[in-house]
Amino acid sequence: MIAEDALDFLKIDVQGGELTTIENGRHCLASAVTIQIEVSFLPLYEKQPTFAEIDQVLRTLGFIPHTFAAINRRMIAPLFDERNPCAALNQLLEADMVYVRDFTQPQRMSDEQLKHLAIIAHHCYRSFDLATNCIFHLCQRQAIAANSMQGYAALAASVQTA
């Protein structure tokens, strides 16, 4: 059993069992700040939840969409490329969607959650704007050094140009 405060980041890729996983893991998600979940825009499996269903459940748990980690597209039949059956044009098929705790409600996150969200945003997704937002709120709370914003801005700039 995972302790309720032990989970910061969860990746869910369970081929149609996303809602069951979320429902059975609600207690583990209480402290989580990031969920990367595979969502489908077109059904691939029997009784597979749609993107809309997953989005609605995660929003009720206090998460909002942040970015796509990966997007898979396919051609729409009857168009087909025999040389590359998975060739894509514009039709969205599925994606790895990154949800984060609703950063527009920072008062609902602890200092530790904001710190962990900043670290995950920076290192996993290069989401320097989200990391900066977390650092801003931590500075406002005096939970970290007042000059942390300037230090992080310099770090993010060096990473972006590297």
List where the protein language model places each region.
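Short amphipathic alpha-helix with an adjacent loop that forms part of the alpha/beta core around
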Residues: 1-3
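Conserved acidic-Pro-Pro-aromatic motif
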Residues: 5-129, 134, 138-139
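Short, charge-rich amphipathic alpha-helical segments embedded
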Residues: 133-162
